[in-house]
């Protein structure tokens, strides 16, 4: 949850697709990488801190640190891509949706008497595979592989939606410039 909130706050402070990139000659994939960088940086820092805390609190064997950190880094990259896409496509509404997703994920974990419709959507929330993976890892139970698969699905979806948002934003910027040049402004 902390990494999701970190990514969400990052794209509240930093614009997902900077205005200067709308008309730059830089390829869209590079604009995407530059846009994802702040969220990834925050996520990496959070993942390292969380791995150290979890390793210490759970008294995990030293050999478990690298796999736990890898899972958290993968979750951080996934969260950065999904929150980038939400804010790039929907702006403020995407941020609100991001907050709603974290609230739903927390409610699904904390409240045992959730409505039936919620139990239907909870497994497909982007935070669910990360929380399931960390819980499985901490308990030494199976489920980490399924969690990685779920995160991979969300990562691919997040990157595709993010790239499409960058392309759309840049096309809108070109159209806006074309309108300005036609109007003589």
Identify the residue ranges that each predicted region occupies.
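Membrane-spanning alpha-helical segments of multipass transporters and channels
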Residues: 1-185
């Amino acid at each position: 949850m902390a990494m999701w909130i970190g990514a969400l706050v990052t794209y509240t402070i930093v614009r997902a697709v900077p205005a200067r990139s709308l008309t730059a000659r830089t390829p869209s994939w590079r604009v995407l990488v530059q846009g994802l960088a702040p969220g990834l940086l925050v996520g990496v820092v959070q993942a390292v801190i969380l791995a150290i805390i979890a390793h210490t609190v759970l008294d995990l064997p030293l050999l478990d640190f690298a796999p736990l950190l890898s899972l958290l880094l993968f979750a951080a990259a996934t969260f950065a891509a999904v929150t980038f896409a939400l804010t790039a496509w929907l702006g403020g509404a995407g941020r609100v949706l991001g907050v709603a997703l974290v609230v739903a994920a927390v409610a699904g974990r904390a409240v045992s008497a959730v409505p039936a419709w919620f139990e239907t959507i909870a497994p497909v929330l982007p935070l669910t595979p990360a929380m399931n993976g960390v819980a499985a890892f901490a308990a030494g139970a199976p489920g980490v592989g399924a969690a990685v698969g779920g995160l991979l699905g969300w990562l691919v979806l997040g990157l595709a939606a993010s790239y499409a948002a960058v392309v759309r934003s840049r096309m809108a910027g070109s159209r806006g410039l074309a309108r300005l040049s036609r109007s003589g402004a």
